[in-house]
């Protein structure tokens, strides 16, 4: 499973990018996106995905469907 950033809620602040341990987050077309192939939801490293902890916008980053 991977996390996904809601492009409607992303403010492009970039706070999520540097905290990702797998470097799965990158800017694209004015917002940030998460590469589902490399996102691990921080399993085995942290209790919660670090991007969710860093994001100041509620419900912007959620598990991908």
Curated annotation (Swiss-Prot):
Ligase among keywords: no
Entry cofactors: [4Fe-4S] cluster
Biological role: Ferredoxins are iron-sulfur proteins that transfer electrons in a wide variety of metabolic reactions. This ferredoxin probably participates in nitrogen fixation.
Binding site for [4Fe-4S] cluster 1: 10, 13, 16, 55
GO molecular function, one term: metal ion binding
One Gene Ontology term from the biological process aspect of the record: nitrogen fixation
Pfam families: Fer4
Lineage: Bacteria, Pseudomonadati, Pseudomonadota, Alphaproteobacteria, Rhodobacterales
Entry protein name: Ferredoxin-1
Keyword Ligase applies: no
Cofactor binding note from Swiss-Prot or TrEMBL: Binds 2 [4Fe-4S] clusters.
Superkingdom of origin: Bacteria
InterPro entries linked: 4Fe4S_Fe-S-bd, 4Fe4S_Fe_S_CS
Chain sites annotated for binding [4Fe-4S] cluster 2: 20, 39, 42, 51
Ranges for domain 4Fe-4S ferredoxin-type: 2-30
Keywords assigned by UniProt, alphabetized: 4Fe-4S, Electron transport, Iron, Iron-sulfur, Metal-binding, Nitrogen fixation, Repeat, Transport
């Amino acid at each position: 499973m991977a996390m996904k950033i809601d492009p409607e809620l992303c403010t492009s602040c970039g706070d999520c990018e540097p905290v990702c341990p797998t470097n799965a987050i990158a800017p694209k077309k004015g917002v940030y996106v998460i590469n589902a192939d490399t996102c691990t939801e921080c399993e085995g490293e942290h209790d919660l995905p670090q991007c969710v902890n860093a994001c100041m916008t509620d419900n912007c980053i959620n598990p991908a469907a």
